[in-house]
Amino acid sequence: MSKTYVGSRVRQLRNERGFSQAALAQMLEISPSYLNQIEHDVRPLTVAVLLRITEVFGVDATFFASQDDTRLVAELREVTLDRDLDIAIDPHEVAEMVSAHPGLACAVVNLHRRYRITTAQLAAATEERFSDGSGRGSITMPHEEVRDYFYQRQNYLHALDTAAEDLTAQMRMHHGDLARELTRRLTEVHGVRINKRIDLGDTVLHRYDPATNTLEISSHLSPGQQVFKMAAELAYLEFGDLIDAMVTDGKFTSAESRTLARLGLANYFAAATVLPYRQFHDVAENFRYDVERLSAFYSVSYETIAHRLSTLQRPSMRGVPFTFVRVDRAGNMSKRQSATGFHFSSSGGTCPLWNVYETFANPGKILVQIAQMPDGRNYLWVARTVELRAARYGQPGKTFAIGLGCELRHAHRLVYSEGLDLSGDPNTAATPIGAGCRVCERDNCPQRAFPALGRALDLDEHRSTVSPYLVKQL
């Protein structure tokens, strides 16, 4: 760390807190000129200064590690591979730009995303000219905006998390179970009437009517699911102003995005209420992040536990930084949140060599995989299917695969690492995976479905190869 140049990150923290260089220099007990040199990468960040910065700002030292840029580097690299732009940029130049100017790199990625969406909408509008379609829509997909909101905050929302934790502690002073205390809070404090219904229909799990102050919950939900729905509605009633402020801070571009963000924040609050941070963090560490054991201990679903684990990034009490995904049999990724720099392609598709997809052939079984991304970084992935059974005959159920991954350097904290070689030795068998065929740079992958963007193909009509799209070697 003695030769680490992270001026842009120090400048980012200072600007976010509204400190002047002189004020921050005084807090760090260094001269303003020294701080100015650090911010402009003239001088490196020493261990002593790093420790003082982490104390002043309450951030983990890993905030200054280059690994935190992984996703942004991959996203910017994906932009440069766009054939429409017709540019050729060396990957090292991309990494240098992200390191020196992360804000500018993020702006380029966001502009390209809007360009791509606008192009798609223009094509759709052209097709709709002879139909009743208007071709209108938000410049950004609502779910993408909300997903990026959580990612930019490392999937941890301190104000909402601590509010839920404090409320849970207050309610449990009565020494009752959480379901009873949530019911008491809703009925006695907010005057809500709670009805358990069996006739809400196949598509409705719960419904709250503000006009009548009535909360209807499907009897088909498990006790844990019913508690979660009550906690989510309590979020609006107790902390509606906080949620509104957080949505405003997110600067969402459409009403749909704002509504989806409010829903996501309410669900975050519910998870933080059912699984309060400090206790859950301590139990998770004690159980070595055994998801099934935690699920049994808290009487909530495997998916709920896995998702909550991906939010344990409180600066003073960090858990393992996880990436959480949920996919279906067709490869659709319906949920993805990350406290790490793990990159998902925006060009479509993921990787068939990833163990998340193998779980559908082994329903209910935990599968563990050491996987290596094209940049050489190794991850430990834990995957299992979850099934939401139908409430009646003839109604289709739902089956998903849940993936939980972390960088290999954190894997020793997980029970799933037992018996695995965590040395990262190049000779150790790690499955080579990628973010998706269109952006994956592995030249000879036998599972490649599409050629990589921006790469010239080495085609020969008189030759057959394992990989259908060999790349020309320069």
Swiss-Prot record:
Keyword Transcription among UniProt keywords: yes
Family assignment from sequence similarity: Belongs to the short-chain fatty acyl-CoA assimilation regulator (ScfR) family.
Entry GO MF terms: DNA binding; DNA-binding transcription factor activity
Gene3D superfamilies, per database record: lambda repressor-like DNA-binding domains
Organism: Mycobacterium tuberculosis (strain ATCC 25618 / H37Rv)
One example of a Gene Ontology biological process annotation: regulation of DNA-templated transcription
Annotation: DNA-binding region: 21-40
Pfam families: HTH_3 (PF01381), Peptidase_M78 (PF06114), ScfRs (PF09856)
Disruption phenotype: Cells lacking this gene show an expression level of icl higher than wild-type during incubation with glucose while remaining approximately at the same level than wild-type during incubation with acetate. ramB expression levels are found to be higher in the deletion mutant than in the wild-type during incubation with acetate or glucose.
Note, other: Was identified as a high-confidence drug target.
Protein name, UniProt field: HTH-type transcriptional regulator RamB
Highest taxon above the source species: Bacteria
High-level lineage: Bacteria, Bacillati, Actinomycetota, Actinomycetes, Mycobacteriales
Intrachain disulfide bonds: none
SUPFAM superfamilies reported for this sequence: lambda repressor-like DNA-binding domains
SMART domains named among the record's database cross-references: HTH_XRE
Protein's UniProt keywords contain Cell membrane: no
GO cellular component entries: plasma membrane
Domain HTH cro/C1-type, first and last residues per copy: 10-64
Keyword field: DNA-binding, Repressor, Transcription, Transcription regulation
InterPro entries, A to Z: Bact_TransReg_Diox, Cro/C1-type_HTH, HTH_RamB, IrrE_HExxH, Lambda_DNA-bd_dom_sf, ScfR_C
Induction of the gene: RamB represses its own expression (independently of the available carbon source) and is negatively regulated by PrpR.
Protein purpose: Involved in the control of the glyoxylate cycle. RamB negatively controls the expression of icl expression during growth on acetate as the sole carbon source. Does not regulate the expression of other genes involved in acetate metabolism.
PROSITE patterns: HTH_CROC1 (PS50943)
